[in-house]
Design a protein with these regions (language model features):
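Conserved P-loop NTPase "ATPase switch" module shared by AAA+ and STAND
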Residues: 4-21
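Structural recognition of the conserved hydrophobic beta-strand(s) that form the central parallel beta-sheet
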Residues: 11, 35-41, 62
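Conserved catalytic/switch belt of AAA+ P-loop NTPases
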Residues: 22-38, 51-52
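Interdomain motor-coupling "hinge/lid" segment immediately C-terminal to the ATP-binding subdomain
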Residues: 41-43, 47-149, 185
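Accessory nucleic acid-recognition modules appended to NTPase machines
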Residues: 103-263
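Nucleic-acid nuclease catalytic cores
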Residues: 248, 290-309
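Active-site ExK catalytic segment of metal-dependent nucleases
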Residues: 262-273
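Domain-level recognition of nuclease-like catalytic cores that cleave nucleotide substrates
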Residues: 301-323
C-alpha cells in the first residue's frame, strides 16, 4: 500500500502469472503519484480483464531482440560485414553479447534456456498442451519454412506423413499459441493492385535467427536467403511498419511496409550480380503501378544504384541507417 505523496515508479514483470493481478494494477494506476510499468513475454498480458480495466489508459511498447545497429554498438570491431554474418547465425538476443565476447560455446545453453522458457512455460503450461513432440515438430516445420507460403493443412499433412498424428484444428491452435508467445510472426498476403488482404498461404518469420540456428542446427545455414529476409522483416517491424507479403499479378513483392505515410516496397536477395536474377527481382517492383518508394536490398558490396526509381542498397548499410 502506498500512502506517501512522493512519486513512485512500479515495475511489474510477468505479473499475469499472479491470480487477480488486474485489480492490483488498476488500484496502482489510479494514484496520481504512481507510474506503472508492466512487462510480459506474451500477448495474454493485455487480454481479458486487464485490457478492459485499462482501456485507453496505457501505451503498449513492443520489444524485439537487438537490431543489427544495436548489436554492432557493443563491439569494437568495425568489420560490419563479418559482424552481420555472425548476427545472421547467432541472432540478436541481448545475452549473446557477453557470451560471444567470453565463451561462444555457452551460446547454445543460453538459447536453450530462452527456448525452453517460451515453449514450456509460455506455451505448453498456459495452453494446457501435453504433446511436446507435436509442438516441437510444428515449431521446427515453421522455423525451417520461414519466408515460404505455408498452410495449416500442409503442415498437418506433412507431419502425418512422418507418423506424427495430428489434425488441422490442432495445428491451428498450436500456431495461435506460437503467435501469442511472440516466438513467430505472421505476414499476411496483400494484393498490391487491389489494395486488399488475401486470406490464405501466409508466411511466417521467427523472432530471432539465433533461436532458429539452435533448433535446426547445421540445417539452419542452408537457407541464407530466407534468413536475410527474416532479418529485414523484423527490422521493418522495429521501424513501426505493418508488414505484408505483396502479390502483383503472378509475381511477389517480398514486403509491403505500411505506416501513416503510405506504403514502401522491399525486395530482398543475397546477390543480384547475375543479370537474370537482377531482372527477376526488379520485375515485381516495376509492376506495382504506383509511385511509393521501392527498394532492393542485397548483400552485394556495390555502391547504391538507382534503376528507374528503384534503389538498390546494401542491406548492412540499410540496417545501419535511419531510414
Amino acid at each position: 500500500k502506498i500512502i506517501s505523496e512522493d512519486n513512485f515508479y512500479v515495475f511489474l514483470d510477468e505479473v499475469q502469472n499472479v491470480p487477480g493481478f488486474q485489480r492490483a494494477v488498476d488500484s496502482l494506476y489510479i494514484k496520481k503519484n504512481v507510474d506503472v510499468y508492466i512487462t510480459g513475454s506474451n500477448a495474454y498480458l493485455l487480454s481479458g480483464e486487464l485490457a478492459t480495466l485499462l482501456s485507453g489508459r496505457y501505451i503498449e511498447i513492443k520489444m524485439l531482440p537487438l537490431s543489427f545497429k544495436e548489436y554492432v554498438s557493443a563491439f569494437d570491431n568495425n568489420n560490419y560485414q563479418q559482424l552481420f554474418l555472425d548476427y545472421m547465425r547467432n541472432g540478436g538476443m541481448p545475452g549473446n553479447i557477453n557470451i560471444l565476447k567470453s565463451n561462444v560455446n555457452d551460446l547454445d545453453k543460453y538459447l536453450d534456456g530462452i527456448f525452453s522458457t517460451i515453449v514450456y512455460k509460455d506455451i505448453m503450461a498456459r495452453n494446457n498442451i501435453t504433446d511436446k513432440l507435436l509442438l516441437e515438430s510444428v515449431i521446427k516445420y515453421i522455423f525451417d519454412s520461414i519466408g515460404s507460403p505455408i498452410s495449416i493443412k500442409k503442415i498437418s499433412d506433412t507431419l502425418t506423413s512422418k507418423g506424427i498424428s495430428t489434425s488441422n484444428h490442432t495445428v491451428e491452435n498450436y500456431i495461435t499459441a506460437l503467435l501469442e508467445s511472440f516466438l513467430i510472426y505472421k505476414a499476411e498476403r496483400f494484393d498490391v493492385k487491389g489494395k486488399n488482404l488475401l486470406a490464405r498461404d501466409y508466411k511466417y518469420y521467427v523472432v530471432d535467427s539465433g533461436l532458429r540456428s539452435y533448433l535446426l542446427g547445421k540445417k539452419a545455414d542452408s537457407d541464407m536467403g530466407h534468413i536475410l529476409e527474416n532479418i529485414v522483416y523484423l527490422e521493418l517491424l522495429r521501424r513501426g511498419y505493418k508488414v505484408y507479403v505483396g502479390k502483383v499479378d503472378d509475381l511477389e513483392v517480398d514486403f509491403v511496409a505500411e505506416n501513416r505515410d503510405g506504403l514502401r516496397y522491399y525486395q530482398v536477395a543475397l546477390t543480384v550480380r547475375d543479370e537474370k536474377v537482377l531482372e527477376r527481382e526488379l520485375r515485381s517492383l516495376q509492376k506495382t503501378g504506383d509511385h511509393y518508394p521501392k527498394t532492393l536490398l542485397t548483400l552485394d558490396m556495390d555502391l547504391e544504384t538507382d534503376y528507374d526509381g528503384i534503389k538498390k542498397i546494401n542491406v548492412v548499410d540499410w540496417l545501419l541507417s535511419d531510414e
